[in-house]
Design a protein with these regions (language model features):
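Non-catalytic structural scaffold of enzyme domains
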Residues: 1-312
Length: 312
């Protein structure tokens, strides 16, 4: 990883199974220019969604998820020659190690799961009596990646509560602040609180799907309505790229010139661009503009996906 800092110019590829990881790309675009760590940095957001009528969490098996993501990873390396790949997606991070790509690539690849685990562990250390509620997709919860890593670090499994939030990422993409998204989040918060063993004990929450951070205010409001106005809610997204901002290399150059590109195999609807673009623009106007002018490439990668099974 230290070899990255020997480079004057760098290509950072951020990928996600949807558009949640745009916030990670935006954070990089916002922080890099003044850092002066590199002379030039190209940031590519690669949407790894393989079909507009499906998604990784709807695939019938883990093997199929691994197969398709592996094809996407190969395309990332072959088409963009990144110096590093950031998997800004918990669903894809938890299956990455199973891909053939992971076993042969020389490109450093970092997933967001460990970032989330570090932040949850930090909160446990600050409040040992608390329980953690992990909001994530079905795939992320089923693998128990966060929970198992925390247990290995010595934290009690009874204090780690996982809640799968089916379809929430899709609702957020359509409207992070919409009435439907707000209602769905409120329902999931209610379900999570019902799973706590000791209702009177302190709790904190962690948003372990990169989409969920877009609706942070809705989560806060839902917890407030449920009687937890001061709850700590963790969003790993802004922390994922911290490792790049090594103090040892800050101001190697007077500034870092950046370029941001967004590429997608599937079309991104105007509604999604409008919804998420406003939120991304608050972090990085350049990333919001790149999203608006994204490159639609139906041949970005060939997932060999049988769409007949979803009626298309």
């Amino acid at each position: 990883m230290n070899n990255l800092f020997d480079k004057n110019e760098i290509t950072i590829l951020v990928t996600d199974s949807g558009l949640g990881g745009l916030s990670v790309a935006a954070d990089l675009a916002a922080r890099l220019p003044k850092s002066g760590i590199f002379e030039k940095a190209r940031i590519i957001f690669f949407n790894a969604l393989f079909h507009p009528g499906s998604g990784y969490n709807f695939l019938p098996s883990e093997e199929e998820k691994v197969r398709i993501f592996n094809i996407a990873l190969q395309a990332m390396e072959e088409k963009y020659h990144p110096d590093i790949i950031l998997i800004a997606c918990n669903t894809l991070s938890v299956i990455y190690d199973q891909t053939p790509f992971a076993k042969k690539t020389k490109v450093p690849v970092l997933g967001i799961v460990e970032t989330g685990v570090d932040l949850i562990a930090e909160q446990f250390d600050n409040n040992p009596d608390a329980s953690a509620i992990i909001f994530a997709t079905q795939t992320t919860i089923e693998t128990n990646s966060h929970k198992n890593m925390l247990i290995k670090r010595g934290y009690e499994k009874e204090k780690i509560i996982g809640l799968p939030c089916s379809m929430l990422a899709d609702y957020i993409e359509e409207g992070a602040n919409s009435e439907m998204t707000t209602l769905v989040i409120s329902e999931y918060v209610s379900q999570a609180l019902e799973k706590t063993n000791k209702p009177s004990a302190p709790i904190f929450a962690s948003l372990n799907c990169t989409h969920y951070g877009y609706s942070m205010e809705q989560f806060k409001a839902a917890f407030k309505d449920a009687g937890y106005p001061d709850i700590k809610i963790i969003n790993p997204n802004p922390e994922m790229s911290n490792f790049l901002f090594n103090k040892k290399y800050i101001n190697r150059y007077s500034e870092t010139e950046i370029n941001v590109d967004v590429v997608s195999k599937t079309k991104i609807t105007e509604a999604k661009i409008a919804s998420l673009g406003k939120l991304v623009e608050k972090i990085s106007p350049q990333t919001a503009e790149a999203t608006k002018n994204y490159k639609y490439d139906p041949d970005l990668f060939d997932a060999k996906f049988d769409s007949s099974r979803i009626g298309l």
